[in-house]
Amino acid sequence: MDVDNGEGQVQVHLKTKQEHYAVPDVPYAIDGTVTTVELNTFVNALLRQKDGSSDTEFDFLVFDEYLRGRLCDHLREKAISFEDAIEIEYVERFPAPEPQDCLLHDDWVSAVKARGKWILSGCYDNSLNLWTNKGKHILTISGHTAPIKAVDWISLDEETGRFVSTSQDQTAMLWKWNVGSNAVDCVSVCKGHERGVDSVSVSPDGLRFATGSWDTMLKVWSAELDDGVEGSSKRMKESGVRTPKITLQGHRESVSAVQWMDATTLLTGSWDYTLKVWDLSLEGIKTEISTNKSIFDASYSKLNRLILTASADKNLRLYDPRTNQGSVVRNTYLGHNAWVQTVMWSTTEEFLFVSGAYDNQNKLWDCRSPKAPLYDLLGHGDKVLDIDWSNPKYIVSGGVDNSVRVFKSRKALAEDTETK
């Protein structure tokens, strides 16, 4: 660590929030040309001196961004003086997800959603499919008359599962699944959109769901078995047809993404280059964020309150809906080689998210690492259309190669280790 390669030495303090990996809190003089390789060697040497610890792989954050090259280059890029004492935070490296299963379908898989030990998928052959997260096919469900575009779970317990699907046939359908008998009934057909329904999201309490469509409309529906609409015609009730509770107009192109931010707030993304935050209590737009590309997907994190977008280019972008500057991108993530179709934040890890693109790849990211993903999740043989990390144990994706790919995440890998 004392070799001088012409960049000089830097005074650093090594910090970690993982107390069992803490090293003495004193300044260290290190060469400016070090990378994560040399820093890992140095920190592990300090830990061995402290308590004889075995080697651990770490990542290093300098001014809230992952170090991906030489320390001196990182500091220059951020206009930081070499004479300042630099704080470097180190964190145990997130383990690489491991491929578990490939679930083969008869057509493109355009929608996936995991919950508990089940995976729900939707296809371009108009069918829905239920699988276990161990790869066993449970059920094929017919009902839609055009390709499925989105799915979401409403509720799930040991006896009953309820979920919603949307389709290019201009409808959303509510389903009730008897887990024991493995029988599914369509509870309601939701009609009101005038073009294909591209996106769906169920409210946190499971009582409502929202849909976005090519007709540019956002609609909110009851997700209850009995929607309780007084005055609905007897014919509509008997036929199982359901109409929207709320219709919101504001987008100029397809509403390609929708998500509940909380009980009364919705996020939408559109091909019209905008993100919109809707206040349902006022039935109007609360915030609008202008972007420079058509938005294919958007994801809001309840942990960090930030929004990610997948767009008609190779980049993912990070926005803060709380800012007063509605068009400012907080960060751009570079790594895909084709249009990015789908993105989702982790529901349990504040900084992590996953993406899928037309380059046939899924990627796992840390939002503090804009220059490169943590890992490439390989397996798809064609474009990725949807990705899901609702179940913290599994990253699940569907694509044009007619497959769902299942990857074990850290929580599942940890359980495997404990059971060995």
Swiss-Prot record:
Q: Tell me one Pfam family matched here.
A: NLE
Where does this polypeptide localize? Nucleus, Nucleolus; Nucleus, Nucleoplasm
**InterPro entries associated with the record:** G-protein_beta_WD-40_rep (IPR020472), NLE (IPR012972), WD40/YVTN_repeat-like_dom_sf (IPR015943), WD40_repeat_CS (IPR019775), WD40_repeat_dom_sf (IPR036322), WD40_rpt (IPR001680), WDR12/Ytm1 (IPR028599)
A molecular-function term among this protein's GO annotations: ribonucleoprotein complex binding
Please report the residue spans annotated as repeat (WD): 104-142, 143-185, 192-231, 250-288, 290-329, 335-375, 379-417
Choose any GO biological process term that the UniProt entry carries and state it.
Answer: maturation of LSU-rRNA from tricistronic rRNA transcript (SSU-rRNA, 5.8S rRNA, LSU-rRNA)
Does the keyword Thylakoid belong to this entry? no
Could you list this entry's UniProt keywords, alphabetically sorted.
Answer: Nucleus, Repeat, Ribosome biogenesis, rRNA processing, WD repeat
The transmembrane residues are none
Segments carrying the region annotation (Ubiquitin-like (UBL) domain) are 10-92
Q: What GO cellular component entries does it have? A: nucleoplasm; PeBoW complex; preribosome, large subunit precursor
What protein family does this chain belong to?
Belongs to the WD repeat WDR12/YTM1 family.
Q: What does this protein do?
A: Required for maturation of ribosomal RNAs and formation of the large ribosomal subunit.
Q: What is the name listed in the Swiss-Prot or TrEMBL entry for this protein? A: Ribosome biogenesis protein WDR12 homolog
Originating organism: Drosophila simulans
